[in-house]
């Protein structure tokens, strides 16, 4: 998968310095009990970005952050583990590679809110927001009563082989132009 490509190496210290599963589960249980007692809602946001080593001079420093489609398999697997651990009762907000190709499946599995960033930073990105809304707007919305561990497990398993999350064998041509972008005076543009 894209997440395991050779150039996306991570150092164990990222895992060792982060919250460990055996500490996280009891903490989440305590926080959920406290939220229930206070008549509040509690949930987890997964996962934002993931630090990986810079190995090919992509950036001037030693680290960069994985996001977008390559992060999806890791994030959905964490959702899978949390959903199973808590019997589908833990609220999960998703921010780890959500896009047009999976937003409906995430929503149907009871994972929401769904936030996106990487997909809209690409060419045509804001048009994708419209496409994503169209894809989920007719789906039934229901108040949270749990997520679907089986559906999340299926998403996690399929993410490992879904071509949307795999690096192409033949690299795509660069979309970047070598031309200098012209200056544009927006005050001269008339919008009617």
Where are the model-predicted features located?
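Glycine-rich phosphate-binding active-site loops on the catalytic face of alpha/beta enzymes
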Residues: 109-131
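Ferredoxin-type iron-sulfur electron-transfer modules and their immediate structural context
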Residues: 127, 131, 138-192
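Catalytic cores of alpha/beta
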Residues: 98-112
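Alpha-helix-loop-beta-strand connector modules within alpha/beta enzyme cores
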Residues: 27-34, 67-88
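Active-site beta-loop-alpha junctions enriched in small/polar residues
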Residues: 1, 47-51, 95-99, 119
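Structural preference for beta-strand elements that scaffold enzyme active sites
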Residues: 39-45, 89-93, 113
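Conserved, mostly hydrophobic/aromatic
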Residues: 44, 82, 106, 114
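Short, small-residue-biased leader/transition segments that mark boundaries at the very start
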Residues: 2-7, 191
């Amino acid at each position: 998968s894209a997440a395991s490509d050779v150039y996306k190496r991570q150092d164990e210290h990222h895992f060792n310095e982060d919250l460990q599963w055996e500490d996280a589960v009891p903490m989440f249980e305590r926080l959920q009990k406290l939220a229930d007692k206070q008549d509040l809602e509690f949930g987890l946001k997964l996962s934002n970005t993931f630090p990986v080593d810079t190995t090919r001079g992509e950036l001037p420093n030693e680290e960069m952050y994985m996001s977008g489609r390559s992060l999806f398999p890791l994030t959905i697997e964490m959702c899978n583990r949390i959903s199973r651990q808590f019997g589908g009762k833990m609220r999960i907000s998703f921010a780890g590679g959500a896009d047009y190709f999976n937003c409906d499946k995430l929503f149907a599995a009871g994972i929401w809110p769904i936030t996106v960033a990487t997909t809209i930073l690409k060419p045509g990105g804001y048009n994708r927001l419209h496409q994503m809304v169209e894809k989920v707007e007719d789906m039934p919305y229901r108040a949270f009563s749990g997520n679907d561990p089986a559906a999340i497990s299926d998403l996690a398993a399929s993410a490992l082989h879904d071509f949307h999350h795999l690096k192409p064998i033949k690299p795509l041509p660069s979309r970047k132009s070598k031309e200098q972008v012209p200056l544009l005076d927006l005050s001269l543009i008339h919008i009617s």
